[in-house]
Amino acid sequence: MKVLIVYHSRTGNTREMAELIAKGVKRVESVEVEVKPVQETRVEELLNVEGVVIGSPTYYGSMAAEIKKFLDESVKFHGKLEGKVGGAFSSSANIAGGNETTIMSILQSLLIHGMIVQGSSKGDHYGPVSVGKPDERSKNQCIEYGQRIAELVLKVS
């Protein structure tokens, strides 16, 4: 079982979140994790994993163009990602910066692929968020999210 974490990060905040989510995935035995910047990720890699988590900074209330391009390219695999586990996370410059709309724009693409999305009954309903550099709360959210993603991968695979 493997989870791929794909992200775009200009300042390093989203990258740090990706690494923290990977830390959470590693808590679950028999689930591997790979963390890659979107610029170094081929869309075909989505076919070879059981879980995908995508992270983006918030630009104008939505995902970065680099993430959008990656998701647009994934259309050629429509129907082939169904049943895989998906998730999203985001960082922004300020508290009203659009983290939830960014996450929802990513999740929309994953749901259209028929992926199973991991939510939370805690405060980070749609996925972890960070305002600026991840604080302790955001760090814990990321680690817990990664663990929940890995546990869901085991359940559905």
Label the predicted regions:
Residues H8-G12:
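Short polar catalytic/cofactor-binding loops
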Residues V3, N13-E16, L20-S157:
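FMN-binding flavodoxin-like domain, especially the glycine-rich phosphate-binding loop
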